[in-house]
Amino acid sequence: MADLKILILAGDAAESLEVMYPYQRLIEEGYDVRIAAPTRKKLHFVVHDFEPGYDTYTEKPGYSWDADIAFAEVNPAEYVALVVPGGRAPEYIRNNADCRRIVQHFFEQNKPVAQICHAPLALAAAGVLKGKKTAAYPQLEPDVKAAGAEFVNSEAVIDGNLVSARAWPDHPAWMREFIKL
């Protein structure tokens, strides 16, 4: 499977676990995994955690990792599947026309797509969520509905070529279902 490539869309402030877990898990399965970002550079990921006394998650600096390829350089036809992690990166990568082009290709070709946490922001901007069932970080329920999708509060939601999850605690179920596609 080393000739089968999977693309991960990331950027600064992507959630460390949501990038690195699928990256390493898919390499274990024998895939050639590439990380794409708005530009080819060292990315700065973050760690989101749930701590007592906070009304929402906290954010701390996470791992740094080199992007293998810039969005503009990506030929999505070279990849068999797509992973879109959460964190804050989807808030701004969704505004990148090449990011939207990449996402649209995977849905037009019915290739497997895994999204988690805040990733629906990027998929919604690409116009591919309408009519889909998807999980997301629960506070994104209004955004999911505004995109014409059905929000499902579950650890691994499968709808056609899309496998989605709420956040990093859902990783095992999320990747297990994605690998089946």
Regions picked out by a protein language model, each given a short descriptive name:
Residues 1-109, 113, 122-130, 141-181:
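Extended, subdomain-level signal for the structured scaffold at the beginning of enzyme domains
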Residues 134:
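Anionic-ligand binding patches
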Residues 117:
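Catalytic nucleophile serine of serine hydrolases
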